[in-house]
UniProtKB/Swiss-Prot annotation:
Catalytically driven reaction(s): Hydrolysis of cellobiose from the reducing end of xyloglucans consisting of a beta-(1->4)-linked glucan carrying alpha-D-xylosyl groups on O-6 of the glucose residues. To be a substrate, the first residue must be unsubstituted, the second residue may bear a xylosyl group, whether further glycosylated or not, and the third residue, which becomes the new terminus by the action of the enzyme, is preferably xylosylated, but this xylose residue must not be further substituted
Glycosylation sites: 113, 180, 246, 290, 304, 387, 564, 603, 662, 754
Similarity comment: family membership: Belongs to the glycosyl hydrolase 74 family.
Keywords from the named record: Carbohydrate metabolism, Cell wall biogenesis/degradation, Glycoprotein, Glycosidase, Hydrolase, Polysaccharide degradation, Repeat, Secreted, Signal
Role this protein plays: Oligoxyloglucan-reducing end-specific xyloglucanase involved in degradation of xyloglucans. Releases the first two glycosyl segments from oligoxyloglucans. Active against cotton xyloglucan, tamarind xyloglucan and tamarind xyloglucan oligomers.
Signal peptide stretch: 1-19
Protein name as catalogued: Probable oligoxyloglucan-reducing end-specific xyloglucanase
EC number from the UniProt entry: 3.2.1.150
Active site per UniProt: 58 (nucleophile), 489 (proton donor)
Length: 815
């Protein structure tokens, strides 16, 4: 299949201009330090500029390593919610002739028509943006491969891009416009497509291209006028790999190229697998091609060429290979990493060769203390930054909840050496410095040469500054830790210190933590819920409560109907002011890009109530819908609220029964629903964010409502924070746009006068792809916590003595 595409680029200058603000005070933005928290899909280093490294992620965009600050710097925080799809990097390209030039191919999903190229002349401090004429898939299958985007070292204004469904593309004007290379033999338009483009820096016109199909390697020696399949490339699986062919068959007819590196001596190293990855891979191989002699050699690590010997018995199938790096100054120094041996044994391994793949050292095995039973891992004490700051959550509390990818090490005291280790780099400016990414973080060593002596390199975490979590829940109680959070994939945290990584919540450990709440008059009592694949014999693995502010947890005795080990989302939990009555609904809601309720299939009851920590659950009278729009009064015990389908519900008996009121008779718009947001210190005071209907407020438990915002206001989310000094009115924060009387951009706003006037909190440089959740702090005036869909968790504080005319400031990033 061949394509021809050309599109004029619409250039937009991003990141550097000051934003118009309405705020009286400037804000400082900081990351709540989790450190990592997501999948690192690629790490690249400039071939000539020392310490110039970039890390790309699937849903958190790209970071640049800043050596003087000893941290990674996010490059695309200017992206707003309308560009959430651009907060994922498909590929990174550096100009080998100019270290200041950087190119990012942005776009999370093929289903979106919003993909773009970001072009920088200052290492990502500012970008010019050009719309891409084809979709990208930074969070799709095959995101572990690459790099798809490459700069011609002989014509540095020329870029080539291997796409997922539009074939091989070429730009001669630095990504402004693109044309299809129509004579390329196979567009491989299978949704994975062409996964890497490599220029030979020693021979002008020679380009190597790989597609994720068997026999997918091609080359040209005349700048793309003519293409040939690389002769002799592996086309069929080695029969010796298929030890039990009737048990697990390869998913491809032959090896599929994953990544490739052209060494300085002309050797082309290629990793292979039977599936695009990062999951689902069962078989793989590593080969090297002598481009001068046109000879292929199988250099796959095996029992005959690897030291220490592979662990036996090894789980079958043995996985594939993806991660690959070659030392620029030594073409025989190679690192490869296996893919998808998890859950083992033996787990995925990093292999180091000093002789071009003739022999290998199993670095993962050497790095693991004796007696692990093939479950390679770092001692948990190594899960720390180079300055000693620990990242304790990487233990995953050794909780039996996931199984498979990302599961905690089965060996207590170890954290897995890694999974999805598809991003690996021998630092071009320091070959003893090796970095590799996982599904959660970046590990690094400065002593990889220890493996040559069959010793363990010293490892540390080099992910500081990278914050990639998806925030699913937040609370800020009146006492104890200022913030507790729930995240996608990594459970949740009690943030005793916002600026250093914290331990993960204890058992039961959830993969996601979707719901949190605290008791208004007993803030040390907290409930949480999330999916858990482990069946506990002594309680419900999907819900827990704490009576000490979130340090220790106890499982609920039973789950509500519809929540079990196979349910991915456990719904919403809330607890009354006394800390004795819990209401739990199996419905959920999503808030990005808009607030939308999702009701469960079995919708035969209202939210269930319990006063004995889940020993018994009662279906209520008066509310027969599993609505997610529920909350508890923070002051009056046994009082719960719900607003769903244009009906306002109130319970004063611990959720056993509800009185229902037609919204229009109370002063509310018809056919609406939202989470009731309650006052921290006044019974019956509630706010509702009703989208284009604005914000409504009541002080009498919902008997009478009043719209407090101007006509034209949009408010999708609302939260309550501490009152301004000298005021009795709590600060309100909304995600939306106040509209009239002053036209405003969509963002985060604060009101100190109950909605009469609004000040802008965020600005055009601090948008982070939009915010899934917002949470005010009842103890710190002006502070708001901001949960994102891939850029972690942030908090914004007013800068003392600085007006907004002086500008918002980025802060320290948490570490």
């Amino acid at each position: 299949m061949k394509f021809w595409l050309q599109q004029l680029g619409l250039a937009v200058l991003c990141a550097s201009s000051a934003a118009a603000r309405t705020a009286e005070h400037a804000y400082e933005f900081k990351s709540v330090a989790i450190t990592g928290g997501g999948y690192i899909t690629g790490i690249v280093g400039h071939p000539a500029e020392k310490n110039l490294l970039y890390a790309r992620t699937d849903i958190g965009s790209t970071y640049r390593w800043e050596q003087e600050l000893n941290k990674w710097i996010p490059l695309t925080d200017f992206l707003g919610p309308e560009d959430e799809n651009l907060l994922g990097t498909e590929s990174v390209a550096m100009d080998p002739t100019d270290p200041n030039r950087l190119y990012l191919a942005q776009g999370r999903y093929l289903s979106s028509n919003n993909s773009a190229f970001f072009v920088s002349n200052d290492r990502g401090a500012t970008f010019t943006r050009y719309r891409a004429p084809f979709p990208m898939g930074a969070n799709e299958l095959g995101r572990n491969n690459g790099e798809r985007l490459a700069v011609n070292p002989f014509k540095p204004n020329e870029l080539w891009m291997g796409t997922r469904n539009a074939g091989l593309m070429k730009s001669s004007d630095r990504a402004k416009t693109w044309t299809n290379v129509t004579n390329f033999p196979d567009a491989a338009a299978n949704g994975i497509g062409i996964t890497f483009v490599i220029f030979d820096p020693q021979h002008e016109g020679t380009i190597y291209v790989g597609a994720c199909i068997p026999g997918g390697l091609y080359y040209t020696t005349d700048g793309g006028k003519n293409w040939e399949s690389i002769p002799g490339q592996p086309m069929q699986w080695d029969p010796s790999l298929l030890v039990y062919p009737n048990e697990t068959q390869p998913q491809s007819a032959g090896p599929q190229p994953m990544k490739a590196v052209l060494a300085s001596n002309g050797a082309l190293y290629v990793t292979y697998a039977d599936y695009p990855g990062p999951w689902g891979v069962a078989y793989g191989a590593v080969h090297v091609y002598n481009t001068t002699a046109s000879i292929w050699t199988d250099i796959t690590p095996n029992a005959n060429n690897t030291s220490p010997k592979p662990y036996t018995p090894q789980a079958f199938p043995a996985g594939g290979y993806c991660g690959l790096s070659v030392a620029p100054d030594d073409p025989d120094t190679v690192v490869v990493v296996s893919l998808d041996r998890d859950p083992g044994p033996a787990l995925d391994s990093m292999y180091l060769s000093r002789d071009g793949g003739k022999t290998w050292k199993d670095v993962s095995q050497l790095s693991t203390p004796p007696g692990s039973g093939g479950y390679w891992g770092h001692p948990i004490a190594e899960a720390a930054l180079s300055n000693g700051t620990t990242v304790p959550w990487l233990s995953f509390n050794w909780g039996p909840q996931w199984g498979g990818y990302g599961a905690p090490s089965p060996v207590k005291g170890l954290t897995k050496f890694g999974w999805w280790m598809t991003a690996v780099l021998i630092d071009p400016s320091n070959p003893d410095h090796v970095l590799y990414g996982t599904g959660a973080t970046i590990w690094a060593t400065d002593t990889i040469a220890q493996a040559d002596k069959n010793l363990a390199p010293k490892w540390y975490i080099q992910a500081q500054g990278i914050e990639e979590t998806v925030t699913l829940a937040m609370i800020s109680p009146r006492e104890g830790a200022h913030l507790l959070s729930g995240a996608g994939d990594i459970n949740g945290f009690r943030h005793d210190d916002l600026d250093t990584p914290q331990p993960m919540f204890g058992l039961p450990v959830f993969s996601n933590l979707n719901t949190l709440d605290w008791a208004g008059q007993r803030p040390e009592v907290i409930v949480r819920g999330g999916p858990c694949g482990h069946q506990y014999p002594d309680g419900c693995g999907q819900a827990a409560y704490s009576t000490d502010g979130g340090s220790e947890w106890t499982k609920f005795q039973t789950c509500i109907k519809g929540v079990n080990t196979s349910v991915h989302n456990p719904g919403v939990m809330t607890i009354d002011a006394s800390g004795k009555y819990v209401v739990w609904t199996s419905a959920m809601y999503v808030v990005s890009p808009s607030v939308q309720a999702v009701t469960p299939p079995a919708n035969d009851s209202g939210p269930y109530a319990s006063s004995d920590w889940g020993k018994t659950w009662t279906s209520p009278r008066g509310l027969t819908v599993q609505t997610p729009y529920i909350s508890a009064d923070r002051v009056q015990p046994k009082t719960f609220y719900a607003f769903s389908g244009g009906v306002w519900y109130v319970s004063t008996d611990g959720g056993l029964s509800y009185d229902a009121f037609n919204a229009t008779k109370l002063g509310l718009p018809a056919h609406t629903g939202a989470v009731p947001v309650v006052s921290v210190d006044r019974a019956g005071e509630i706010w509702l964010a009703l989208g284009s209907n604005g914000v409504y407020h009541t002080t009498d438990f919902g008997k009478r409502w009043k719209r407090i915002t101007h006509k034209g206001t949009v408010a999708d989310l609302i939260t309550v924070g501490a009152a301004a000094p000298g005021s009795t009115k709590p600060a309100l924060f909304i995600r939306g746009s106040p509209g009239h009387p002053k036209k405003s951009d969509y963002g985060i706003y604060r009101s100190d006068d109950n909605g009469s006037t609004w000040d802008r909190v965020d600005d055009d440089d601090h948008r982070y792809g939009g915010f899934n959740l917002i949470q005010g702090d009842p103890r710190v005036y002006g502070r708001v916590y901001l949960g994102t869909g891939g850029r972690g968790l942030l908090y914004a504080d007013i800068v003392p003595g600085q007006s907004d005319k002086e500008g918002n400031v980025p802060g320290t990033g948490g570490i």
